[in-house]
Amino acid sequence: MKLDPLTVPRFTGIIVFLIVSTWAFPMSSTAQAEIQSLEFPYFTLRNRTGSPEPGDAYGGERSDLKAGLCRVEELDLGVLAPLADLAPNFLLEELLRVQDVQELDIATVLEGLAASAGERGPALYVHGYYIGFEKGCRRAALFQQNADLSGRFLWFSWPSDGAAAYYTHDEADLYWSLPDLADTIIKLEQRFGSKNVDVIGHSLGARGVILALAEVANRDPDIRLGHVVLLAPDVDFGIFERILPRIAPIAESITIYATTGDRPLALSAQLHGYPRLGEAGNDVSGLTGVEVIDLSDLPSEGPTGHLYHIYSRAVGEDLRRLLNAGERADGRQGLVVQSENVWRLRPTARE
């Protein structure tokens, strides 16, 4: 896509950062193939802003459930495009722009998803803290691409403020969103069938998934979902231990991705006073039936260690094998068993 006047300041900043980052991070990108244009459906509880800019179509206020399609495209860097190939992975989202947002009724979105998802059914993804709508669209596009979820992907965007200082406000908005998230999971299972709906949550969004699943299990104990994936889950480890027996029966599998180098989770543990589920090193032997993937051997894909699901090729490939091929941890290439329910993911040759 070509630049418009509103994009020029951001474009200039990107160019400067590209030049600096190629000096500071000389390793080439290991991300998946380029995103030229990618469209996916969304559900959101955000308010309409009335802005003509697609990325600003929704704000951070609470509202009723809406649905539609979001299209993300690459910025056209012209002759400077080769610099992007040398830039670190965590810069990739800055090379994307939300080009179009089309709001549709929920039934139309579900019909389109049914036509594109195939036999596996949809994969519902819930984002985490500090995610405005525009940033969320860009990261959702990267995650869909990295995990190869095209056609299956459905993004659930709750009204995070998109501001680093508003963590507790985001927590409140997440809890407010839980009934609609639970309703969405139930309706998807009713539409697509038993074990045909995968549910994925990242960071604070993983906490939302866990709590919503507890409500789903209470309301409909006979429901059967597919794979539940918790990426860098920002949730009290002890609370998850107590909730697990309630949600395990309704999921085909539950997989946790954790690492020792996750800085936001370390800060969350200090804030809350208890270890987080996404921190490697917890005693997970009592998490019966849960598969834990330890990513501590992977190289850092960014300054936070929190976004491996969108930047690490190895994590993307492991997710693809789990979510698309249905392979359990003991059969997936690249995993080395550590204990009864813990595997370490080895980096690929290109990471």
Language model features by range: what are they?
Residues 181, 201, 205, 209:
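Gly/Ala-rich beta-loop-alpha elbow adjacent to hydrolase catalytic centers
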